[in-house]
Amino acid sequence: MALDDISAVPKGALDTDPAVERPPPLLDADRSDSERLQPGVKRAEMLRKGWTRQGLIIAFTGLFLATLSINFGDYSTQVYVPYATSAFKQHSAMSAARVVGNITRIAAYPIIAKLGDVFGRAEMFILSIVFQAVGYAIYAGCKNVGQYIAGGIFEAIGSTGFGLTQQVFVADVTNLINRAVWSTLPDSLTVIPALYLGTEIAEAVLEKNEWRWGFGMWAIIEPVCSVLLVGTMLYYQKRARKDPSPAEFASEPTERNVDDGWWKRIYNLVWVQLDAFGAILLLLGLSLFLVPLSLTGSGNSDDWHRGSFIAMLVLGVVIFVAFLAWDTWCAKKPFIPYRMIKNRTVAAACLLGILDFFHYSVFSVFFTSYLQVAAHHGAGPATRIDNSLRVAFQVAGIFAAYFMKFTKRSQVWVFTGVPLCVLGMGVLLYLVDMGEGRVGNEAAFVTAKSLIGIGRGFYQTASQVSVQAKVSRGEVSVVTAVFFAAMSIGGAIGTSVAGAIWRSTLPPKLAQHLPAELKDQAQAIFGSIVVAQKYEVGTPARDAIDMCYRQSQRMLAIAALAALAPMLIIMFFLENVPLTDETTLIELHGNREAVKKNHSGGEGKEARS
């Protein structure tokens, strides 16, 4: 692919091509308070115009290197968690670490998007890498569960920030027709080797060193691997400041006067630009809503009977509604502009993400346990089956991106992906309990999971580009954060529902079907797959255990398929976004009417590549 494809501005469309007339930019005087570009967005816009071919080559090389190191760190450090658990001898407390990490990741998306819009993309890369390095350093030196959880908070913020800023950076420097390609390549080319080689690295580290060094080494490796990306961005950012500013930036006020007192500057930064009150409402609302969902996950569904959990859930919803009201009517620089929420493409894409990740979590939480107990697979094959969805997703994302590039439309790939997800889940529903004690083999499960992964790769890649195309350039980071957060929220809810179904289904079935002499072991068998696997395959006890696992996993599969079914209707609400010069110009300048006027008499010319 030619490097010209990376350019955010259609080649020749804004400057030299007489057939495509540049629309008048929207100046601050023409914008509402919420539409005025924030400092970080202005900086990103000036940087976008200042990139050279050589600079983009170096920047994307650095992006691939940084992404590779972060993905290797993520997948290899998962191996060390049981060792940390054993060191603290507080296995039950580790679930609290997962809860805090999940909540932190979801809440971090909109906060990081806002910080990126205020301070800039390079600055957010730096902040994210620092947070992740500090998190790994705390992991390496932690002496108790509290410190381990603190490390998890830093690591969660860092990894979430890097992933989001990576996608926003790609959106900044690509036009719509090439965006899907470049947004999928960094992860697609690095996740697959990290997925399989990360565990090999972890095992090699454990042979010669303890788990603490396994965490700590990434606090060194990741910042080093990120120097090329961050250094290149800072260099071109500094160079862009020295160049004459384009008219649309030169004429815009800086949102504050240099003669203002320090307290006015602090007020403008904290209250207006960062919307501190909105941030507090958002964090409180999400935390109160997600804590009970997370704590009632795979093993504590009985806690729903506690009044405090219901109260937290209700209060969280109320505060989140208050946040939406504040953002809509009061905030000058809202986290989520109201016009974005009411856009049907954005709303539909977020609903697709919520339902898809709800289905995935409902089915997958206990799937590897089911594979090892009822399907008699070892831990290795069970992991390979589960990972097949991730691999298929990454590969399909690349193909979907290129298909979008050549068809110059997004909706058709949503229409392709969603039915594939439903089909794959339908096959899984059949495979988990085929009747007469039969279940699918490894190849069948891999095929079904791969169908879901391919479907997700198609619809999610197309949906992300679609939602980014429906907002102005200054709102790309926010809409991307909302899109990712919606998927995470769906996953959190799905985990809780899976725990409730599993806990209400498996124990009664075990108590009912186990041989009389083993009925008192029902709770022990439910609580540990190790205990369940101790019973020899083919014995009455193991046959009863296998049947109970099959029936319980089938219930989860039914719930997952039911969640996917509405997606077949929701997908029609996404607009068919044309990936053309005209759409790119609208995104760049936010002046839809001027662009339409300049392109009257026919569709805009397609972006050149």
Curated annotation (Swiss-Prot):
Keyword Iron: yes
Taxonomic superkingdom: Eukaryota
Subcellular location: Membrane
GO biological process, one term: transmembrane transport
UniProt keyword annotations, A-Z: Ion transport, Iron, Iron transport, Membrane, Transmembrane, Transmembrane helix, Transport
Keyword Transmembrane in annotation: yes
Bilayer topology: Multi-pass membrane protein
Disordered, as annotated region: 1-35
GO molecular function: enterobactin transmembrane transporter activity; siderophore-iron transmembrane transporter activity
Residues passing through the membrane, by range: 56-73, 119-141, 148-170, 214-236, 267-289, 304-326, 346-368, 388-406, 413-432, 480-502, 555-574
One Pfam family this sequence matches: MFS_1
Predominant location category: membrane
A Gene Ontology cellular-component term: plasma membrane
Family listed: Belongs to the major facilitator superfamily.
Primary role: Involved in the transport of siderophore enterobactin and so has a role in iron homeostasis.
Identification of the protein by name: Siderophore iron transporter mirA
Taxonomic path: Eukaryota, Fungi, Dikarya, Ascomycota, Pezizomycotina
